[in-house]
């Protein structure tokens, strides 16, 4: 099941719905036509808070809509290419984890390549590379492994198809396609998965290792989420998932 939040040309109101046969269908319309009302599908936050019941009802409506889509009139469903897809969930918090040692090693090597002749950043990067490549100590028995992460800019989260304006303070903007795991609640911790485009200003990053990422990650529209919240049953094994993304960057004439 692919859950979406979207806007249509006819209304400024955000719709929470599902993809049926390449159509964006609001849950409000599905409930009305199927005669099955529930507050769990009012918006994405209600959906996440009421898992797993909300997922069960959503799938029932999806199955009904798939059988009866031909009965929907104008304005009740919308071709995906005619709507504006927003981030599929209203994000309460966004954390980016460094879970892949190979990725961290590659990142350190790339930064070292470009900054090796910079006396202000080279020592910091050497220390970072040493820390990344050093073997991690094993967690004590009965204690969870310590994970490193940073908190993302909550004001820069956007959906699919948005163009990232190139910040004037960087000449090396990097876009990484990552897998986002969407948290539901204690009853069902994993609500589903999204593609997450993580945008970074690499030439600014070295000097921010000491105090935490600021300009490196704080550019407008620098956290792109979407296009769908895909439920676990459709994803399968997320560790084997191949992520593909296409990014649009606009330097606006201001890129150094």
Give the residues covered by each predicted segment.
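Short N-terminal binding/cap micro-motifs at the start of the first secondary-structure element
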Residues: 11-16
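A short, surface-exposed interaction/processing loop segment used at functional sites
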Residues: 21-38
């Amino acid at each position: 099941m692919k859950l979406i939040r979207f806007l249509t040309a006819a209304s400024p109101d955000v719709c929470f719905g599902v993809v049926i046969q390449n159509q964006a269908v609001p849950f409000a319309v599905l409930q009305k036509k199927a005669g099955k009302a529930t507050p769990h599908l009012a918006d994405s936050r209600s959906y996440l808070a009421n898992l797993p019941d909300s997922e069960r009802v959503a799938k029932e409506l999806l199955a009904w809509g798939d059988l009866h889509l031909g009965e929907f009139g104008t304005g009740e469903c919308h071709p995906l290419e005619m709507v504006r897809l927003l981030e599929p969930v209203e994000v309460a918090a966004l954390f980016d984890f460094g879970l892949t040692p190979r990725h961290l090693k590659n990142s350190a090597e790339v930064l070292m390549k470009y900054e090796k002749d910079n006396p202000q950043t080279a020592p910091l990067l050497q220390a970072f590379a040493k820390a990344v490549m050093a073997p991690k100590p094993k967690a004590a028995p009965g204690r969870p492994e310590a994970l490193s992460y940073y908190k993302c800019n909550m004001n820069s989260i956007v959906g699919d198809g948005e163009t990232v304006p190139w910040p004037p303070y960087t000449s090396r903007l990097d876009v990484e396609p990552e897998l986002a795991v969407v948290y539901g609640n204690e009853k069902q911790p994993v609500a589903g998965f999204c593609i997450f485009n993580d945008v970074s200003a690499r030439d600014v990053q070295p000097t921010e290792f000491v105090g935490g990422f600021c300009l490196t990650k704080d550019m407008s529209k620098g956290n792109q989420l979407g296009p769908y919240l895909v439920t676990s049953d459709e994803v399968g094994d997320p560790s084997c998932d191949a992520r593909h993304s296409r990014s649009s960057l606009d330097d606006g004439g201001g890129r150094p």
